[in-house]
Amino acid sequence: MDAIVVDSQNCFIIILLCSFSLISYFVFFKKPKVNFDLLPSPPSLPIIGHLHLLLSTLIHKSLQKLSSKYGPLLHLRIFNIPFILVSSDSLAYEIFRDHDVNVSSRGVGAIDESLAFGSSGFIQAPYGDYWKFMKKLIATKLLGPQPLVRSQDFRSEELERFYKRLFDKAMKKESVMIHKEASRFVNNSLYKMCTGRSFSVENNEVERIMELTADLGALSQKFFVSKMFRKLLEKLGISLFKTEIMVVSRRFSELVERILIEYEEKMDGHQGTQFMDALLAAYRDENTEYKITRSHIKSLLTEFFIGAADASSIAIQWAMADIINNREILEKLREEIDSVVGKTRLVQETDLPNLPYLQAVVKEGLRLHPPTPLVVREFQEGCEIGGFFVPKNTTLIVNSYAMMRDPDSWQDPDEFKPERFLASLSREEDKKEKILNFLPFGSGRRMCPGSNLGYIFVGTAIGMMVQCFDWEINGDKINMEEATGGFLITMAHPLTCTPIPLPRTQNSLISHL
């Protein structure tokens, strides 16, 4: 029986309709084999379980409200699918300390054939030989400390180009969309790190990458829902949102394939990168440690552009919005940069260790606006969490957004206060180092492997924009409302402002670039 492909703007309505279908009757009424009665759970409804409590376009906030009302460890059920929701730093610490391997699976992918988060991807790969091989390759050839030092010049070149684009806009008194310009900077840097060359200006490659990344970002919530309900709906021959997802995935596949072909054609005539050369060697060499396919390479590159590039540019936009809304923080940050870097050169990533307030600003922005608010894993075996038994194959959702705004862990949790990250640890606070209350990039062995690169991108971009420009906005304050419909936390009203070159740095910087 051929699968039925369903696309809809409202996935919850589709699932509700399915619940009343005669075909799905026995599926939805089938009881889980393991009893969850002892685990705290909000009141549920017949058939749909807790679905009615989650009908929100901002799912992380819906889950935060549930935890605030019913507790930090909850059992939720949507139809017959069980979830464990964790919103406590102490519980998260227990899970990632004692059960890290057990929760090292992300479960099934949304759609196997999709380049983004499909069966060929690194992000969605099960914890096993392939994932371990790719993680080692990524760490040793691209994102580890030594590879980041080797690729430092690439990012420095792109930071200068970023500055010059903003300066040109400023001279023309044109406004800029911070997310778009930051995305261009990050994508160009990442592409150069992977391939050793810049995007083709003539072919508008970076614009096409940004467009496709935005399209996939808009589908991120549908990816999440499709993944969560895949096992259940496969019994009915239904595949949620497959058409929409595959259209964008195929476009990305065509673009990445052209990138690979161009790299291969020029391998003999230009300097490549250790990362791409290692990937292609693992693809071609029959005796390699782990034989990968071309789809593996294309999926990995796609995930880099979606995960690293989009998440970093989103974080840059949020941090700049918070800085512009708090003039005293902007001035304090600029003073620190001037005292360490001076006024005759751009801030560089080698300056970051000597800029503690800039580091604090970056961390505070990530605390308030983690690009990915939910950490989703799956228990491979049954275990005990917080004194309660959790059966195997149960989905784990760690609400990092809620944890990083928990008033029990953070004073004035909804306020932008970078100083909180400057406070020295007392003996009492030393104990809190064992509690995970700050995890913008996840935790455990499946945490984001590009977290160090993310800090570099956000730190250098914010540092340059504060060092070199003042910023004009329409109105007194920037609207910090979150956008709906996506899994990433983005701004409902993208930050648009006008850069004004600072006279004290303008001439000296230009003469040195």
Curated annotation (Swiss-Prot):
GO terms for cellular component: membrane. Its EC number is 1.14.-.-. InterPro entries: Cyt_P450, Cyt_P450_CS, Cyt_P450_E_grp-I, Cyt_P450_sf, Plant_metabolite_P450s. Induction: Induced by jasmonate. It comes from Arabidopsis thaliana. Pfam families: p450. Its cofactor is heme. Cleaves the arabidiol side chain at C15 to form 14-apo-arabidiol and a side-chain fragment. Involved in the biosynthesis of the volatile homoterpene (E)-4,8-dimethyl-1,3,7-nonatriene (DMNT) in roots. Involved in the production of DMNT by degrading the triterpene arabidiol. May be involved in the defense again the fungal root pathogen Pythium irregulare by producing DMNT. GO terms for biological process: defense response to fungus; terpene biosynthetic process. This is Cytochrome P450 705A1. Heme binds at residue 448. Belongs to the cytochrome P450 family. Expressed in root stele, root cortex, root epidermis, root pericycle of the root hair zone, and quiescent center at the root meristematic zone. It is a single-pass membrane protein. It is an enzyme of class 1 (oxidoreductase). Keywords: Heme, Iron, Membrane, Metal-binding, Monooxygenase, Oxidoreductase, Plant defense, Transmembrane, Transmembrane helix. CDD domains: CYP93 (cd20655). Its main location: membrane. It comes from the Eukaryota. The keyword Iron applies. The keyword Lipid metabolism does not apply. It is found in: Membrane. The chain crosses the membrane at residues 9-29. One of its GO terms (molecular function) is heme binding. SUPFAM superfamilies: Cytochrome P450 (SSF48264).
